[in-house]
Regions:
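Long, charged, low-complexity intrinsically disordered regions
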Residues: 1-93
């Protein structure tokens, strides 16, 4: 049961709390591509605060994505350094 794929809603919010850190290297780029294909160009990735390992991993992944225009930590009122806001390029037609 644990190996069954989980279907995520493609709604511009990706909450990584339930994922193993090893899963996010494929999950984050795939989720961003799905958002981009649907015209969702502002994405919020919730990685939690903790000691920052997951945030650093997410940011390293984002730096390598050609579809990413920019990313920044969320506003303190909405999670601050526990979430990252990502701006994507429109999908090529």
């Amino acid at each position: 049961m644990a190996d069954e794929p989980i279907e995520l809603p493609i709604d511009g919010v990706l909450d990584l709390h339930t994922f193993d850190p090893r899963e996010i290297k494929d999950l984050v780029p795939n989720y961003l591509a799905a958002c981009q294909a649907r015209g969702i160009l502002s994405v919020r990735i919730i990685h939690g605060k903790g000691i920052g390992n997951l945030r650093r991993t997410v940011h390293a992944i984002l730096q390598k994505q050609p579809a990413v225009i920019s990313f920044t930590l969320d506003h303190p009122q909405f999670g601050g350094w526990g979430a990252t806001l990502v701006q994507l390029r429109p999908a090529a037609v």
